[in-house]
Amino acid sequence: MTQNPYESPENPQALKIARAGKSLSLLNVLAVTGIVALVIALVLPSIRWAPRSRGRTPCMNNLKNITLAVISYAERHNAFPPAYTVDADGNRLHSWRTLILPCLDKQTLYESIDLSKPWNDPANAKAYGTEVDVFRCPSARLSGGLTTYLGNAANGGCFTGDRPRPVSVTRYPHRQTLLVVEVASSHAVHWMAPQDADETILLNFGSGDKSAHIGVLNAGFVDGTVRTLSVDLDSHIRRALISASGRDEINSTEY
């Protein structure tokens, strides 16, 4: 009986085939490993970025609702709400956030507030203890009724003390005028508090501040749009955006 030459381990031809098979297997493994590494390199950054992007979406939705509520208020009263209301002695009572509650379908909460007494008066304790979801960025992880959504209360901004600002004197195009902005958690205030973002906060907010969204912040504009702005936005662009009476137009590619 003739012996199969390929069954002998000492057969040179068999050894060559075995070595070739091992080489091909090694090459296949290296090729697959390289492909997997490439896929990971391409996909991992997007996976890391996805949660940040998803975290911004609910925040932008909140700002959209707040911005549209302010605009709805302005349409009813022919002016933006004042930054705050005051008593006969000029003491601050309530924030514009309280005034727009009916425009946010929070009529019952609004009616429970005694507007003649300060926001933190015992008479308003129930409202004070109420957390309003639309005023809370999910990524900010705040509690106790705190909000990072502040009005543009800079000099010449949309929220001018206790005096409502007429829409008619607000600069056009409205897409270039900042209305409401999200600030760092360190600047958070109670949603009922008559406090907002002054010029110092708006002009100096930068990468050193701990924004809820890395490197960016969300902002609502007078035209009703909500956009994401870089925390490194140039100072002259910031000044133009916070001015409700400015005449200088800005190229939309600049912000």
Per-range role (PLM):
Residues 55-255:
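Surface-exposed loop/linker segments characteristic of extracytoplasmic
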Residues 13, 17-19, 152, 243:
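Residue-level detector of intrinsically disordered, flexible termini
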Residues 4, 20-23, 166:
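Positively charged, low-complexity intrinsically disordered regions
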